[in-house]
Amino acid sequence: MERVYNFSAGPSILPLPVLEKVQKELLNYNGTGMSIMEMSHRSSYFQSIIEEASNLLRELMSIPDEYEVLFLQGGASLQFSMIPLNLMNTYKKAGYVLTGSWSKKALQEAEKVGEVQVIASSEQEKFTTIPKLDGLLSDEKLDYVHITTNNTIEGTKYVDIPHVEKVPLVADMSSNILSERYDVSKFGLIYAGAQKNLGPAGLTIAIIKRDLIGEADRSCPTMLNYETYSKNNSLYNTPPSFSIYVTKLVLEWLKEQGGVSAIEEQNRMKSSLLYNFLDESKLFTSPVDPTYRSLMNIPFTTPSEELNSEFLQKAKERGLVTLKGHRSVGGMRASIYNAMPVQGVQQLVNYMKEFELENR
């Protein structure tokens, strides 16, 4: 069977050259006579892999020296707990901006550790927009402020990162890390599950300012303490070695594409193809405020569940798969991460045009 265009929100499409290299090296990595999956994480071979992955990420994101890159497990969902356990240490209070399902889950975990202030929310608008934050981030008696830069389920993103002067800004970038340029120095901590834009599931990356490490309460479990990973080069225990290896290959691929600025240009072109059609369509609609449309996750729907089901079935027959929207939103959703080629988006748009003609 030929490969399909996979529009899954995660685990998601990986670059074909990366998969081919994994296939080539699967049984015998670099002349070692063994697979990465069989290799000791203490070996010099793996030490070089994790170091190269860290260096590539630093280069691609222009990460300043005062930040650490940590390779973790547990997905972004575990970070919802790790962050307050490590950072909620002075005022026992944090600020959260609610922009979708994942930011709400992050807030709920933080509430188990300390006090949470909802700085702003777009829940009344069904998370179809990003709330205005002008003048709302002036409270200095917060240990940190948490945002989600891209809302995977709802299809919104921040156009401008909020300015927080004296409080660390923490960002969940799981679904748009490396898709567009960000000034890392604006953040105290950035975290992302790998399975959308970085690599396979099983790995989580945290980029954290060094002065935020080492302040966790003594009751913080060892494996939930950032200091544990910082002191041990992310090798305190066995890391998700295969996921780190594939992520390194994805970062190499991204560098070959011209880096983040080049991929951002391509991502804007890909999303414009789909948004331009949606804006002109008489059948398909997008619920998202146009000002805050995501480059990565694009929800859309037809007027009825019957048409949605028919659309999804016929799309699958054409090799356009995993387009069903999240159960909390319904309809369809096209996730067009870095690895999705322009041709995939163009084929989707072509099919949508045909479907509309058939269902006038």
Curated annotation (Swiss-Prot):
Gene: serC
UniProt xrefs under SUPFAM superfamilies: PLP-dependent transferases
Name this polypeptide is given: Phosphoserine aminotransferase
Annotated source species: Bacillus cereus (strain ATCC 14579 / DSM 31 / CCUG 7414 / JCM 2152 / NBRC 15305 / NCIMB 9373 / NCTC 2599 / NRRL B-3711)
Enzyme class: transferase
Lineage: Bacteria, Bacillati, Bacillota, Bacilli, Bacillales
Function: Catalyzes the reversible conversion of 3-phosphohydroxypyruvate to phosphoserine and of 3-hydroxy-2-oxo-4-phosphonooxybutanoate to phosphohydroxythreonine.
Domain of life from the UniProt record: Bacteria
Pathway: Amino-acid biosynthesis; L-serine biosynthesis; L-serine from 3-phospho-D-glycerate: step 2/3
InterPro entries listed in its UniProt record: Aminotrans_V_dom, Aminotrans_V_PyrdxlP_BS, Pser_aminoTfrase, PyrdxlP-dep_Trfase, PyrdxlP-dep_Trfase_major, PyrdxlP-dep_Trfase_small
Signal peptide (residue range): none
E.C. number: 2.6.1.52
Family according to the record: Belongs to the class-V pyridoxal-phosphate-dependent aminotransferase family. SerC subfamily.
Cofactor(s) for this UniProt protein: pyridoxal 5'-phosphate
